[in-house]
């Protein structure tokens, strides 16, 4: 036998294997790699495969105690990125045995935990993951999913309407509950805690939950519709988070909320499991996502974070609006909307989808459009997102000149008008403004909203665009 040979050798000698044929059980990753000057793309891709699986910087004698061919990641293909200098898409295959079953935390720790600080790379971005069906089946996924949520709420054939209570910080619990009641009474399906509403000196969580529950039940009694408020259970530790979720269940409310990136995947999966066992819907906010996903050449694309959330568990997740104040190019946004909702998604590079993904009946997640949207956006939102979505107007409800309830009425009327027009075969993209103006004739609340927001636009170039 050759025996152990100490020393450093190029990664590509072991981890670049263009002849490798991927297996149905492999986790496949597409990385956007920007090598340092003088580093060949094959070496950069192999380094990513090595450092995110079994490799380290030097040969170690314990390599001989295992079967590296069975466990190593492999860079099996490299494509140059069109229009970009010294950028490549490196495709890496990971054997399934490298990952703990049912753990998004372990999956990310392995694939992106260490390699992003690697000196041989100027920048690195995880663009997409293919999760094999064998691994998908180890996850519970969303607590309930789209169909079960509609059945619980008894609401069909239209998007759901929400509103984030503003100002997000500073209201007392009683005033907060009053704002919730006004919005729900006016016709919204949900109201929402903002992502940073946890348990602060001006409003402790228990007081907020009590006043919001009162608002929910009072508005339900008046409207005959099932209502909800996303009670944010995010906390400084898992025990406190679960205490808040348990209290929400004891109050009999239908939904709680979690900030899944700041709270962490372990906490999120724990909460999602509790929600399924106890009949609570789970709304997910993606606070901190732009720190990770906004730069085009470094970080993790949101389509990966969206897939991870579907595995970890959540019934709603914020997905961008295309038309509002926050980043979101149309094709890119629609690519992760289908990855959240559909059961089988074909590879489609025109939308940035690198791999075919089969979710094998894992429940779907409702995308939430939220951020700088108002009644004039309603036709575009209905056309872009379709029925299985939540359209969330914070300032677009609470900023109504007549108050919260009329703001909610304006949103509900504009939504119903757009859905009816679509069902009659009208073109929302072309006739949207006319549809809204027609509805204004029989809704003074909508007419007032249209007057306030007729000139508001957010016209900036998206940072994250398709190649």
Curated annotation (Swiss-Prot):
Its main location: plastid. Mg(2+) binds at residues 192, 194-195. Its cofactor is Mg(2+). Keywords: Calvin cycle, Carbon dioxide fixation, Chloroplast, Disulfide bond, Lyase, Magnesium, Metal-binding, Methylation, Monooxygenase, Oxidoreductase, Photorespiration, Photosynthesis, Plastid. The modification N6,N6,N6-trimethyllysine is found at residue 5. GO terms for cellular component: chloroplast. Its EC number is 4.1.1.39. Substrate binds at residues 114, 164, 168, 286, 318, 370. InterPro entries: RuBisCO, RuBisCo_large_chain_AS, RuBisCO_lsu_C, RuBisCO_lsu_C_sf, RuBisCO_lsu_fd_N, RuBisCO_lsu_N_sf, RuBisCO_lsuI. The keyword Ligase does not apply. The disulfide bond which can form in the large chain dimeric partners within the hexadecamer appears to be associated with oxidative stress and protein turnover. Binds 1 Mg(2+) ion per subunit. The active site is at residues 166, 285. The record marks 325 as: Transition state stabilizer. It comes from the Eukaryota. One of its GO terms (biological process) is photorespiration. Transmembrane segments: none annotated. The basic functional RuBisCO is composed of a large chain homodimer in a 'head-to-tail' conformation. In form I RuBisCO this homodimer is arranged in a barrel-like tetramer with the small subunits forming a tetrameric 'cap' on each end of the 'barrel'. Heterohexadecamer of 8 large chains and 8 small chains; disulfide-linked. The disulfide link is formed within the large subunit homodimers. RuBisCO catalyzes two reactions: the carboxylation of D-ribulose 1,5-bisphosphate, the primary event in carbon dioxide fixation, as well as the oxidative fragmentation of the pentose substrate in the photorespiration process. Both reactions occur simultaneously and in competition at the same active site. HAMAP family: RuBisCO_L_type1. Belongs to the RuBisCO large chain family. Type I subfamily. This is Ribulose bisphosphate carboxylase large chain. It comes from Hydrophyllum virginianum. The lineage of its organism: Eukaryota, Viridiplantae, Streptophyta, Embryophyta, Tracheophyta.
């Amino acid at each position: 036998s050759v025996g152990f040979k100490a020393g450093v050798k190029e990664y590509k000698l072991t981890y670049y294997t263009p002849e490798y044929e991927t297996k149905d059980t492999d986790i496949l990753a597409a990385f956007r790699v920007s090598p340092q000057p003088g580093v060949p793309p094959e070496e950069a891709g192999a380094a990513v495969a090595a450092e995110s699986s079994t490799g380290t910087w030097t040969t170690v004698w314990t390599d001989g105690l295992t079967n590296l061919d069975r466990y190593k990641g492999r860079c099996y293909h490299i494509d140059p990125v069109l229009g970009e200098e010294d950028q490549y898409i490196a495709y890496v295959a990971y054997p399934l045995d490298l990952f703990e079953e049912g753990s998004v935390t372990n999956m990310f720790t392995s694939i992106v935990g260490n390699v992003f600080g690697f000196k041989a790379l100027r920048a690195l971005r995880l663009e997409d993951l293919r999760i094999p069906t064998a691994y998908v089946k180890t996850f519970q996924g969303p607590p309930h999913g789209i169909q079960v949520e509609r059945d619980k709420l008894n609401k069909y054939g239209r998007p759901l309407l929400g509103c984030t209570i503003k100002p997000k910080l500073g209201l007392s619990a009683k005033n907060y509950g009053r704002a919730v009641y006004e919005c729900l009474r006016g016709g919204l399906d949900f109201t929402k805690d903002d992502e940073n509403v946890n348990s602060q000196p001006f409003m402790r969580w228990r007081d907020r939950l009590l006043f919001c529950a009162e608002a929910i039940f009072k508005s339900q009694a008046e409207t005959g519709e099932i209502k909800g408020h996303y009670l944010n259970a995010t906390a400084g530790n898992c025990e406190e988070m679960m205490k808040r979720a348990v209290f929400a269940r004891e109050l009999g409310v239908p939904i709680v909320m979690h900030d899944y990136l700041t709270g962490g995947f372990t906490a999120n999966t724990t909460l999602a499991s509790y929600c399924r066992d106890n009949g609570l819907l789970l709304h997910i906010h993606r606070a901190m996502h732009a720190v990770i996903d906004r730069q085009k050449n470094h970080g993790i694309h949101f389509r990966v974070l969206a897939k991870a959330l579907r595995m970890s568990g959540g019934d709603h997740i914020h997905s961008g609006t295309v038309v509002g104040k926050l980043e979101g190019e149309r094709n890119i946004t629609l690519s992760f909307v289908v990855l959240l909702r559909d059961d089988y998604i074909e590879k489609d590079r025109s939308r940035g989808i690198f791999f075919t993904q089969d979710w094998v009946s894992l429940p779907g997640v409702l995308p939430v459009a939220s951020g700088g949207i108002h009644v004039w956006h309603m036709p575009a939102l209905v056309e872009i997102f379709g029925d299985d979505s939540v359209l969330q107007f914070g300032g677009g409800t609470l900023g109504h000149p007549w108050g919260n309830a009329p703001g909610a009425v304006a949103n509900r009327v504009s939504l119903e008008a757009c859905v009816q027009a679509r069902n009659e075969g009208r073109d929302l993209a072309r006739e949207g403004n006319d549809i809204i103006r027609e509805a204004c004739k029989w809704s003074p609340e909508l007419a007032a909203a249209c007057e306030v927001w007729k000139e508001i636009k957010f016209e900036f170039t998206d940072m994250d665009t398709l190649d």
